[in-house]
């Protein structure tokens, strides 16, 4: 008998993230054992994740578990997990919008969904939130199309476009677009009171003014991640808000058991800044607001898909901190969010507190398929 388990595996780049895609029936049914297997697949806990497939970056330490739909209106079930790099934690408390963009193509290629040319619409049941997502995937020769002329900032080259619709994800974690009922709350912190907006669309997100955390909002990843005091303060705010909206009982529990969600971002009005990935200047005229999003206690080098849907929705709710810094876009439904590596546009329509549209364009590509091996002795 082999001393290693062999598990079918696919690695996909989805949006500006990269993840491991597994079928649910290829994993142990017991949750505790399943999480041990997942940690070994990724090589966690280890700062380098050297003994697993992950890449020692929060944006590549992501998992999608796919299975037949348990929802009457959906085509496929999808469970997302953020796998901690340094701790033995598999966080199922929210969804990843970028990884979601890989689910439709995976479902088509693995025959969970019948391929229809030239475009297949896949209804995805996200089990983390109980919400439905919709992916419009271009199809060619019975498989998800890869080549195309769609460029998304943060990914080299171009690929086939995919529309991801998060319009049905309002109140994903808390049941309400505004979990506290307020557009702005005043939070007591170790550095004094600070205004926060907590909005729950696709995933719950916390928004603060960049100036209130002594930042401009246009800083590069190195500057932000090198500021230990800032990182600690943002995590304090995030943990307090996590407790406030009922996602954790204590701040300690929020940091240890729900490190990924809710996310927190600091925002500012449109202005010029430098794309850290290319060195090019992004004009303030090309964005409607600028945001820096924290994820797993470090800066997200681009912008999370779910946070994009949430930020766009927050921008359309009068009085929120995001709305306060939003450029006047007139009748235009698209909100252009400036992030460290470019701009991400999102179609955002909110009327009378109801999210009518939250959609963005992503691309995805299957990189590898094969088997991942897990040492059985390490599962004890």
From Swiss-Prot:
Gene Ontology molecular function terms on file: methylitaconate delta-isomerase activity
Pathway assigned to this chain's UniProt record: Cofactor degradation; nicotinate degradation; propanoate and pyruvate from 6-hydroxynicotinate: step 6/8
pH effect summary: Optimum pH is 6.8-8.2.
Pfam family of the protein (one): PrpF
Record field: catalytic activity: 2-methylene-3-methylsuccinate = dimethylmaleate
Enzyme class name: isomerase
Regulation: Inhibited by oxidized glutathione, p-chloromercuriphenylsulfonic acid and iodoacetic acid. Not inhibited by the chelating agent alpha,alpha-dipyridyl. Activity is slightly increased by EDTA. Not activated by Fe(2+), Mg(2+), Mn(2+) or Ca(2+). Unaffected by K(+), Na(+), NH4(+), Rb(+) or Li(+).
GO process terms (BP): nicotinate catabolic process
Keyword annotations from UniProtKB, A to Z: Isomerase
InterPro entries named among the record's database cross-references: PrpF-like
Residues making up the signal peptide according to the UniProt record: none
Induction of synthesis: By nicotinate.
Record EC number: 5.3.3.6
Keyword Isomerase included in the entry's annotation: yes
Family: Belongs to the PrpF family.
Record's subunit section: Homotetramer.
Primary role: Catalyzes the reversible isomerization of (R)-3-methylitaconate to 2,3-dimethylmaleate. Has very low isomerase activity with itaconate.
The name this protein goes by in its record: 3-methylitaconate isomerase
Species whose genome carries this gene: Eubacterium barkeri
Gene designation: mii
């Amino acid at each position: 008998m082999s001393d290693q388990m062999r598990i079918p595996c696919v690695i996909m780049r989805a949006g500006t993230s990269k993840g491991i895609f597994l079928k649910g029936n290829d994993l142990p049914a017991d949750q505790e054992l399943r999480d041990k297997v997942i940690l070994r697949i990724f090589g966690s806990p280890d700062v380098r994740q050297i003994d697993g497939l992950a890449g020692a970056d929060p944006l590549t330490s992501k998992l999608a578990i796919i299975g037949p739909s348990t929802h009457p209106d959906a085509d496929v079930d999808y469970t997302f997990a953020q796998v901690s790099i340094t701790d033995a934690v598999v966080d199922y408390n929210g969804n990843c919008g970028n990884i979601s963009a890989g689910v439709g193509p995976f479902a088509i290629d693995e025959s969970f969904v019948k391929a229809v040319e030239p475009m297949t619409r896949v209804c995805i049941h996200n089990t983390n939130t109980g919400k439905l997502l919709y992916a419009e995937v271009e199809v060619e020769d019975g498989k998800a199309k890869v080549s195309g002329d769609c460029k998304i900032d943060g990914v080299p080259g171009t690929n086939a476009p995919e529309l991801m619709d998060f319009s049905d994800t309002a109140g994903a974690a808390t049941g309400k677009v505004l979990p506290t009922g307020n557009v702005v709350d005043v939070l007591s912190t170790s550095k004094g009171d600070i205004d926060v907006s907590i909005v729950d669309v696709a995933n719950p997100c916390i928004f603060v003014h960049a100036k209130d955390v002594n930042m401009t909002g246009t800083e590069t990843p190195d500057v932000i991640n090198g500021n230990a005091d800032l990182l600690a303060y943002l995590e304090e705010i995030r943990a307090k808000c996590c407790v406030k909206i009922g996602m954790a009982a204590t701040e300690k529990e929020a940091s240890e058991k729900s490190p990924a969600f809710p996310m927190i971002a600091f925002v500012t009005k449109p202005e010029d800044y430098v794309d850290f990935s290319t060195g090019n200047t992004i004009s303030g005229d090309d964005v409607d607001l600028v945001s820096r999003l924290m994820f797993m206690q470090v800066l997200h080098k681009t912008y999370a898909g779910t946070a994009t849907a949430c930020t766009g929705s927050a921008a359309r709710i009068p009085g929120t901190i995001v709305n306060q810094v939003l450029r006047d876009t007139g009748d235009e439904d698209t909100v252009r969010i400036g992030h460290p590596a470019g701009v991400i546009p999102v179609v955002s329509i909110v009327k009378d507190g109801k999210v009518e549209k939250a959609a963005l364009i992503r691309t995805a590509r299957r990189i590898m398929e094969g088997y991942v091996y897990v040492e059985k002795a390490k599962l004890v």
